[in-house]
Amino acid sequence: NQEGLFGGR
């Protein structure tokens, strides 16, 4: 989910 938002991965 947050992969593209602030680079969670």
From Swiss-Prot:
GO CC list: extracellular region
Role played: Cleaved by the protease thrombin to yield monomers which, together with fibrinogen alpha (FGA) and fibrinogen gamma (FGG), polymerize to form an insoluble fibrin matrix. Fibrin has a major function in hemostasis as one of the primary components of blood clots. In addition, functions during the early stages of wound repair to stabilize the lesion and guide cell migration during re-epithelialization. Was originally thought to be essential for platelet aggregation, based on in vitro studies using anticoagulated blood.
Organism: Theropithecus gelada
Keywords per UniProt: Adaptive immunity, Blood coagulation, Coiled coil, Disulfide bond, Hemostasis, Immunity, Innate immunity, Secreted
Posttranslational mods: Conversion of fibrinogen to fibrin is triggered by thrombin, which cleaves fibrinopeptides A and B from alpha and beta chains, and thus exposes the N-terminal polymerization sites responsible for the formation of the soft clot.
Subunit structure, as described in the record: Heterohexamer; disulfide linked. Contains 2 sets of 3 non-identical chains (alpha, beta and gamma). The 2 heterotrimers are in head to head conformation with the N-termini in a small central domain.
Subcellular compartments: Secreted
Domain remarks: A long coiled coil structure formed by 3 polypeptide chains connects the central nodule to the C-terminal domains (distal nodules). The long C-terminal ends of the alpha chains fold back, contributing a fourth strand to the coiled coil structure.
GO biological process, one term: adaptive immune response
Keyword flag Disulfide bond: yes
Highest taxon listed in the record's lineage: Eukaryota
Protein name per UniProt: Fibrinogen beta chain
Keyword RNA-binding included in the entry's annotation: no
